[in-house]
Amino acid sequence: MTRSVVTDVPPVAVGGAAGSLLRWGLGHVLPSGSVWHWSTLTVNVVGALLLGLLLEALTRPGVESRRTHTARLLLGTGLLGGFTTYSTFAQELWEQVRSGDTTQALAYAAVTLVAGLLAAAAGMALGTRLGHRASSHARGVVEGAQ
């Protein structure tokens, strides 16, 4: 194993475990068994929003620092990767189609995909805005110190 693999595995594993537990917990809190699988829809849309925000906040021009790299692995790949679930979404769609609810399956798929795209875009916009605010604040602090 290379050094980067050895150092990258722990943050992904810890984040993935935490994200999976959060998803599992939400599955017990939100209603289930309906045409709309609220827990899956919620985790995927919230996950898209947070991933858009996180990646926009972490992807500033320049070389990625070790701290940023670890944060991306822990929070993005690990936490949000474990929190969101494409496989459950696909299984729920297949069950709806197999039981004859094709129209509902298509509606559920469309709502999930559109809401996810909008959430990711909103997260990226928020990340950009927060990044500009942070850099403006940092410039003000530096200018005030001179």
How would you label these PLM feature ranges?
Residues 1-146:
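Membrane-interface helix-loop junctions in multi-pass transporters/channels
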